[in-house]
């Protein structure tokens, strides 16, 4: 795993000296992604910069890498897990190789399959390939969005980078996207492909693109996460799931450097660890928790590790450590991300890096196998399907006048509201009606439903559970789960691999019918059945906490003064009604409401603003800033 920057010049440059210096400065911003070495390639059409974290073919796997008399050049972030099989296939067709790296195999795959190359890959990746003969730049991002890829157009040049902070070096200004900010306040992340900078976008997962001289960037989707449930015997599906996970974990452990695994108290990471231990008996595991009672899975993780006969290394985080590291962590995010669980992920990655270079983790299991409690909702709302639409409207009016917290109010609201109007994913922080009080430039014509309506349209033939999974895969998973997984581990120069988010595993998971996702009130039912006899009994049906954080308690106690000062000193008055935010904090401390997630969401934006706009709380790594800030 690594990081890269690049530029495509629509008109060839007469000289490249200035561009070479710019690429070096951009590359310097992501040293944490690849501390082992750097590399560069330039011609009149493209400039490539690369930072390497050595994983496969440590001696000869450097980049940028060329193939076939320097006709093709590549910069690549990620891992291709089927590179051995692809190499054998290409060798049978007459291709030869000079290294043992997956990078060279990827380049040869493009040489042979051209724009069909991305669909041949099994892995996590973002890459750029320059074809010198045809003057074509080709790039792609992996199917689920495990690896990031940002881009921006400045005059006649298109810039790319593994992290948005590199693009800030090339830009002369930041234009804060107020629509993206408004959506952030509901989702707790900026929904892709947007970023909080109006000039910068993300290449979407499962898509590829080409650029030709004097032409625009052209995108094409090569993978869609489509669900296709089938009715078949439970035992058959259990075996297919188990076999797919064993196969995925096996190929995800291909590495020339030490591999470990994160371990919480739930089924996801425990399943990964239990299987990985069979391939690598000396596997090290890593866990994190807090002193606050009920907010640590360290003891459960240690019990799991002991049952498997492997080592567990844990870290307990104090509120002081959390506060001290938060500005640096927000800088690593690139865009504000208000998931409190991102911070313990940063700390467990920091601890793991002392022992290994690669770590496995359980991201994606909830979205693929039906693990969130909210996925049980469609079953509980079945009786409402028989109620005529006119009566549902009347019941919604009744619910509207019921006091907040009154028993039955929420049930009526959910049961009488279509799924596409009430569900936007796993997090809904600020409702539209409340955002009017928060944001000074609230746009009443913009709704969080604008983000999800495309995904509901694409999944219109699905069951409600599959619709929810589809929405989560396209919003929550890529915007929150995978963003924090990449940014928090790469901040510590640690490669994270997620075996559940594998094309082979998804192909099996997509066939699971609803009744085998949630059964008898149990989430991820089929995954748990597949784990029987493999995962220690004490964790098999245990509810997952993940990386829980005692934010609700801290905002009233250890963090209260610190948070209050940030709100009062923040220079976000152009965007935020700060008096309203302070009132949220007062009500929270007085136990009038649990406003912890709302306060945290605004707080993270304020810290982001202080780093990117106000130039305060700047980590040492932040050596380049844009020259001008534009508020729109």
Curated annotation (Swiss-Prot):
Its EC number is 6.3.5.4. Keywords: Amino-acid biosynthesis, Asparagine biosynthesis, ATP-binding, Glutamine amidotransferase, Ligase, Nucleotide-binding. The active site is at 2 (for gatase activity). The record marks 363 as: Important for beta-aspartyl-AMP intermediate formation. CDD domains: Asn_synthase_B_C (cd01991), AsnB (cd00712). One of its GO terms (molecular function) is asparagine synthase (glutamine-hydrolyzing) activity. It catalyses: L-aspartate + L-glutamine + ATP + H2O = L-asparagine + L-glutamate + AMP + diphosphate + H(+). L-glutamine binds at residues 52-56, 77-79, 102. GO terms for biological process: L-asparagine biosynthetic process. Pathway: Amino-acid biosynthesis; L-asparagine biosynthesis; L-asparagine from L-aspartate (L-Gln route): step 1/1. InterPro entries: Asn_synth_AEB, Asn_synthase, ASN_synthetase/amidase, AsnB_N, GATase_2_dom, Ntn_hydrolases_N, Rossmann-like_a/b/a_fold. Residues 2-214 form the Glutamine amidotransferase type-2 domain. Belongs to the asparagine synthetase family. Main asparagine synthetase in vegetative cells. This is Asparagine synthetase [glutamine-hydrolyzing] 1. It comes from Bacillus subtilis (strain 168). The lineage of its organism: Bacteria, Bacillati, Bacillota, Bacilli, Bacillales.
């Amino acid at each position: 795993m690594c990081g890269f920057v690049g530029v495509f010049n629509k008109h060839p440059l007469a000289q490249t000296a200035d561009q070479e210096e710019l690429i070096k400065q951009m590359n310097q911003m992501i040293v944490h992604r690849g501390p082992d070495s750097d590399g560069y390639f330039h011609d009149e059409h493209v400039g490539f910069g690369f930072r390497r974290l050595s994983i496969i073919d440590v001696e000869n796997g450097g980049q940028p890498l060329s193939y076939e008399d320097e006709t093709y050049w590549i910069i690549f972030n990620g891992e291709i897990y089927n590179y051995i099989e692809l190499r054998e296939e290409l060798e049978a067709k007459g291709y030869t190789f000079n290294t043992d790296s997956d990078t060279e195999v990827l380049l040869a795959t493009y040489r042979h399959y051209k724009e069909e190359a991305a669909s041949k890959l099994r892995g996590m990746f973002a890459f750029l390939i320059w074809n010198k003969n045809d003057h074509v730049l080709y790039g792609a991002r992996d199917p689920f969005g495990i690896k990031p890829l940002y881009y921006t157009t400045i005059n006649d040049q298109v810039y790319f980078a593994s992290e948005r902070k590199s693009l800030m070096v090339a830009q002369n200004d930041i234009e804060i996207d107020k629509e993206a900010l408004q959506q952030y306040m509901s989702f707790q992340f900026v929904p892709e492909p947007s970023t909080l900078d109006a000039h910068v976008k993300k290449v979407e997962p499962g898509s590829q693109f080409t650029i030709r001289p004097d032409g625009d960037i052209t995108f094409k989707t090569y993978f869609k996460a489509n669900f296709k449930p089938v009715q078949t015997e439970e035992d058959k599906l259990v075996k297919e799931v188990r076999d797919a996970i064993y196969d995925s974990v096996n190929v995800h452990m291909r590495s020339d450097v030490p591999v470990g695994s994160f371990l919480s108290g739930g089924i996801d990471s425990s399943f990964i660890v239990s299987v990985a231990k069979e391939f690598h008996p000396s596997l090290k595991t890593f866990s994190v928790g807090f002193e606050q009672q009920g907010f640590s899975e360290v003891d459960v993780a240690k019990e799991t590790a002991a049952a498997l006969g492997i080592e567990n290394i844990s870290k307990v985080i104090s509120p002081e450590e959390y506060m001290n590291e938060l500005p640096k962590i927000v800088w690593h995010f690139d865009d504000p991300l208000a998931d409190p669980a991102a911070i313990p992920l940063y700390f467990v990655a920091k601890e793991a890096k002392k022992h290994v270079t690669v770590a496995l983790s359980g991201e994606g299991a909830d979205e693929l196998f039906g693990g969130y409690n909210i996925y049980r909702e469609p079953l509980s709302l079945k009786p409402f399907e028989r109620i005529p639409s006119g009566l549902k409207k009347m019941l919604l009016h009744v619910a509207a006048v019921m006091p907040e917290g009154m028993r039955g109010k929420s049930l009526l609201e959910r049961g009488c509201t279509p799924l596409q109007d009430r569900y936007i994913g796993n997090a809904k922080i600020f409702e539209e009606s409340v955002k009017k009080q928060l944001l000074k430039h609230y746009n009443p014509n913009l709704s969080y439903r604008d983000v999800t309506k495309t995904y509901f349209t694409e999944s219109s033939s699905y069951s409600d559970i599959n619709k929810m999974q589809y929405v989560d895969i396209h919003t929550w998973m890529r915007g929150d789960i995978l963003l924090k997984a990449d940014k928090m581990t790469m901040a510590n120069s640690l490669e994270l691999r997620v075996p559940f988010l594998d094309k082979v595993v998804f192909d099996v998971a997509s066939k699971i019918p609803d009744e085998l996702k949630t059964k008898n009130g149990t989430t991820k039912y089929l995954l748990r059945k597949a784990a029987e006899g493999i995962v220690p009994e004490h964790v098999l049906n245990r509810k997952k906490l993940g990386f829980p954080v005692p934010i609700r308690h801290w905002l009233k106690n250890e963090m209260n003064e610190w948070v209050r000062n940030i709100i009062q000193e923040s220079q976000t008055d152009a965007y935020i009604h700060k008096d309203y935010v302070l009132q949220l904090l007062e009500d929270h401390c007085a136990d009038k409401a649990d406003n912890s997630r709302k306060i945290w969401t605004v707080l993270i934006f304020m810290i982001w603003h202080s780093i990117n706009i106000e130039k305060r709380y700047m980590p040492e790594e932040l050596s380049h800033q844009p020259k001008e800030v534009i508020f729109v």
